């Protein structure tokens, strides 16, 4: 099976390398020539356009920043739709709006091209070690056919429903992650402002009910002042905006999500849009006039 992979960013590059390690033949594309060179050195081939990739691959994976990027690559000039033969499958592993997934799928289906929306969670560390969580929407038979391909990059791969369901699930995930980071930031800022060592507070609570994967991943980053992006604030704002747009469409209320998105937008205005989303703690630190350190 020859696999196309478009998008070799923070997540896409290690994901593509895991496919190579699993023995898949890979053809890649990205706007960053250094990323392409790195993956070629690991054993991949390259092509200049999405159309060129689609002409030679049975299945194409996209890992791109947002809905417009996926639409352009899938449906635009020199896009997948221009090169793919009937029966080709697009697995979009980007985090985009559920409505966009459905629109892209409909356009591709008219040309005999199937699609799964399969966003991931776990950030760069899990992309590197191949233990991502993948949440997938689309035809169950297509999911079953390409389960092993997705599993080569993941610890868990779960079918969540029809096309778009994968991205609804990812939005739910992103809401939980954002609110967890906000709660952690409030708690550690409280401890610091009250004169208690936040590292000791973290060690004391991590084994109890307040403990979580988010707490263990992000509290050390805050205390070490390490905001190297595993997942950028800019991208989390995008996800929360998509969650709010989706909630408006279905009549759900997300007041905490709206509040945290406002905080992240304030941080972006302060120049932290490209920082890791754990830098949400900086919003609370600024208000309290403290810095959360070990």
Swiss-Prot record:
Transmembrane spans: none
A GO molecular-function descriptor: NAD binding
Record's keyword annotation contains Cell inner membrane: no
Chain positions recorded as NAD(+) binding sites: 4-18, 95, 238
UniProt source species: Escherichia coli (strain K12)
GO biological process: D-glucarate catabolic process; galactarate catabolic process; glyoxylate metabolic process
Similarity remark: Belongs to the HIBADH-related family. 2-hydroxy-3-oxopropionate reductase subfamily.
Residues at the active site: 170
Keyword NAD: yes
Stated name of the protein: 2-hydroxy-3-oxopropionate reductase
Annotated pathway: Carbohydrate acid metabolism; galactarate degradation; D-glycerate from galactarate: step 3/3
Pfam families per the UniProt record, alphabetical: NAD_binding_11 (PF14833), NAD_binding_2 (PF03446)
Top enzyme category: oxidoreductase
Record-linked InterPro entries: 3-OH-isobutyrate_DH-rel_CS, 6-PGluconate_DH-like_C_sf, 6PGD_dom2, 6PGDH_NADP-bd, HIBADH-like_NADP-bd, HIBADH-related, NAD(P)-bd_dom_sf, Tartro_sem_red
Induction: Induced by D-galactarate, D-glucarate and D-glycerate.
Keyword annotations: NAD, Oxidoreductase
């Amino acid at each position: 099976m020859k696999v196309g992979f478009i998008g070799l960013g923070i997540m896409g590059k290690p994901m593509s390398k895991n496919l190579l390690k699993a023995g898949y033949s890979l053809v890649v594309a990205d706007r960053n020539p250094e990323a392409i060179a790195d993956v070629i050195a690991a054993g991949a081939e390259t092509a200049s356009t999405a159309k060129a990739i689609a002409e030679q691959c049975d299945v194409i994976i996209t890992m791109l920043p947002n809905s417009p990027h996926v639409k352009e690559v899938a449906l635009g000039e020199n896009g997948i739709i221009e090169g793919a033969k009937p029966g080709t499958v697009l697995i979009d592993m980007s985090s985009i709006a559920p409505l966009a997934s459905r629109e892209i799928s409909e356009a591709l289906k008219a040309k005999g091209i199937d699609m799964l929306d399969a966003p991931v969670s776990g950030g760069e560390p899990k992309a590197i070690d191949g233990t991502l969580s993948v949440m997938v929407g689309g035809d169950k038979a297509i999911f079953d056919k390409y389960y092993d391909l997705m599993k080569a990059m993941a610890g868990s791969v779960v079918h969540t429903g029809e096309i778009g369901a994968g991205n609804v699930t990812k939005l739910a995930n992103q809401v939980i992650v954002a609110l967890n980071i906000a709660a952690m930031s409030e708690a550690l800022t409280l401890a610091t402002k009250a004169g208690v060592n936040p590292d000791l507070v973290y060690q004391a609570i991590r084994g109890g009910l307040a403990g979580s994967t988010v707490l263990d991943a992000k509290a050390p980053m805050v205390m070490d002042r390490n905001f190297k992006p595993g997942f950028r604030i800019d991208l989390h704002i995008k996800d929360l905006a998509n969650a709010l747009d989706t909630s408006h469409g279905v009549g759900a209320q997300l007041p905490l999500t709206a509040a945290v998105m406002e905080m992240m937008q304030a941080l972006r205005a302060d120049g932290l849009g490209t920082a890791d989303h754990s830098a949400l703690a900086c919003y609370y630190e600024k208000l309290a006039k403290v810095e959360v350190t070990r």
